[in-house]
């Protein structure tokens, strides 16, 4: 199979377990190919765990899930050193993050210290325990979920932490027809029975192919112009950082690869910008008072910034 056929096969296989959410699956896979992590804002019970299991099966990855609660400790994520009386030495006991695909469920119920431990692993690709450093397996993907802010026992993730996630999306309720189909059979069981389409090494190769997608200088300038517009907007108190433009660039390349191209276009930028950038901006007090949202302000900016004409 060529690259496009492989990507289509991955989506088709995961779609067997996740009904009616093709757009969500495409966004998640795009972020995975871009080398990023995924943050999902939604209520419990809409299929987030099923999606995670479906992708790990289809991509041939090891998988661990942790339910975040206030009593979860950083060592539960990173691991710890334990004295081995037989050898007389300390040995490392791996934590939940020592895996390919880590589902951090309800991350905004954990303490800030525990959240920071996970985000450090996400950023560095390694973890430190008692002065020793351990690399996490590659590829390493974190899918974190959080309940809507204001739910019992939740605390809002600060901007510095949400900025570490490549994309922030919602799943939403299924349609009436799809919910009926869900009732007819167990989607979780369907996810567990999925076949691996690729191996972890194949995924690393796909990531390299995404990174090699050609981007014209004028398209880079377009991304920077979008970021600059967020920094200058009166509706925004905190605009897109350079990390945000780097994420936009990576997602643009990955989206082009998803479409079967080895070059990026302005349409790729516009396709990924809403869910790559909206969680990276902070609205001003006046904008919030006026009922504006990050998505609506960003949409207006995307419509106002001139698109480049590629040669």
Feature map (PLM): residue ranges:
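Conserved alpha-helical scaffold flanking the Walker A/P-loop in AAA+ ATPase domains
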Residues: 27-30, 83-103
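Dynamic helix-loop-helix/coil hinge segments at AAA+ ATPase domain boundaries and subdomain interfaces
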Residues: 1-24, 212-214
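P-loop (Walker A) phosphate-binding loop of NTP-binding proteins
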Residues: 43, 77, 145
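Walker B catalytic acidic pair
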Residues: 42, 105-106, 117
């Amino acid at each position: 199979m060529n690259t496009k056929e492989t990507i289509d096969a991955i989506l088709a296989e995961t779609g067997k377990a996740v009904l009616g959410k093709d757009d969500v699956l495409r966004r998640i896979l795009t972020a995975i190919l871009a080398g990023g992590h995924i943050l999902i804002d939604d209520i419990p019970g809409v299929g987030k765990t099923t999606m995670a299991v479906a992708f790990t099966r289809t991509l041939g990855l090891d998988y661990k899930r942790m339910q975040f609660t206030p009593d979860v400790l950083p060592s539960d994520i990173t691991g710890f050193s334990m004295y081995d009386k037989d050898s007389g030495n300390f040995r490392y006991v791996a934590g939940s993050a020592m895996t390919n695909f880590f589902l951090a469920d309800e991350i905004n119920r954990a303490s800030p210290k525990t959240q920071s431990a996970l985000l450090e692993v996400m950023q560095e690709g390694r973890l430190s325990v008692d002065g020793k450093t351990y690399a996490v397996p590659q590829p390493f993907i974190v899918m974190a979920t959080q309940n809507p802010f204001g739910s019992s026992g939740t605390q809002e993730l600060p901007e510095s932490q949400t900025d570490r996630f490549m994309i922030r999306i919602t799943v939403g309720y299924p349609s009436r027809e799809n919910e009926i189909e869900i009732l007819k059979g167990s989607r979780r069981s369907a996810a567990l029975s999925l076949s691996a389409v690729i191996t972890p090494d194949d995924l690393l190769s796909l990531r390299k192919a995404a990174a090699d997608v050609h981007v014209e200088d004028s398209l880079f300038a377009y991304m920077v112009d979008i970021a600059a517009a967020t920094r200058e907007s009166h509706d925004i108190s905190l605009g897109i950082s350079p990390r945000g433009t780097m994420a936009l660039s990576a997602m643009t390349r990955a989206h082009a690869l998803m479409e079967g191209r080895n070059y990026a276009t302005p349409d790729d930028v516009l396709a990924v910008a809403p869910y790559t950038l909206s969680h990276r901006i902070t609205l001003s007090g006046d904008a919030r008072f006026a009922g504006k949202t990050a998505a609506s302000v960003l949409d207006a900016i995307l419509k106002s910034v001139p698109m480049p004409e590629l040669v």
